[in-house]
């Protein structure tokens, strides 16, 4: 009797973990519109592994890059960069989850979407980029934060970060209007429903 109960509880526990994992994954994919004409998935961890970035042979090259960068930035910036290079998840982006790239008629900008692991870490990473004048200061909008950089708009909330390819101020303003809707979008209105 006890074995049967343990067996059933084990199956239930596995099912709960599976459902929880699925719901977390789909939350950030809800920003992908249902009418997306092209969607590509990129597995960053697999890509880094295949590129040999985890290999011991590349450790020396990584250290040389860090040393070269160290001379051109202040200590706090370098410390954050070194932390992210040694552990990419410190960037605030969940590198274990797929990154999706999409285009759609309703949001006609090439967009990459990644899962947020830590909104605070992402803010810290972007603040470093602001200090190094790589991007503009972070601003708040209707339910999300954003910054701009050369040819790109980065928008994020607590679950998703979007990198949108835009050209000029008029496209940035139009994209910002659409971002509000995408970040509030439910699974019913997203590609998650058709997946």
Outline where the language-model segments fall:
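Short, surface-exposed loop and linker segments with low hydrophobicity and enrichment for Pro/Ser/Thr
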Residues: 10, 105-106, 150-159
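Sec-dependent bacterial lipoprotein signal peptides
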Residues: 1-20
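Structural boundary/hinge residues at secondary-structure and domain interfaces
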Residues: 22-148, 169-170, 174-195
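Charged, amphipathic alpha-helical scaffolding segments
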Residues: 153-174, 178
């Amino acid at each position: 009797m006890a074995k049967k109960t343990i067996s059933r509880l084990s199956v239930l526990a596995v099912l709960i973990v599976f459902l929880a994992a699925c719901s977390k994954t789909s939350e950030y994919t809800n920003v992908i519109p249902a009418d997306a004409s092209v969607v590509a998935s990129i597995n960053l961890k697999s890509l880094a592994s295949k590129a040999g970035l985890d290999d011991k042979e590349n450790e020396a090259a990584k250290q040389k890059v860090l040393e070269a960068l160290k001379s051109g930035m202040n200590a706090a910036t370098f410390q954050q960069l070194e932390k992210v290079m040694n552990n990419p998840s410190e960037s605030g982006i969940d590198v274990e989850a797929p990154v999706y790239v999409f285009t759609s008629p309703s949001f006609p900008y090439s967009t990459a979407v990644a899962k947020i692991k830590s909104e605070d870490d992402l803010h810290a990473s972007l603040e470093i980029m602001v200090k190094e004048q790589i991007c503009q200061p972070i601003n708040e909008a209707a339910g999300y934060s954003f910054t701009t950089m050369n040819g790109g708009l980065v928008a994020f909330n607590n679950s998703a970060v979007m990198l949108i390819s835009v050209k000029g101020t008029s496209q940035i303003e139009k994209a910002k209007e659409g971002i509000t809707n995408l970040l509030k979008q439910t699974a019913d209105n997203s590609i998650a429903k058709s997946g």
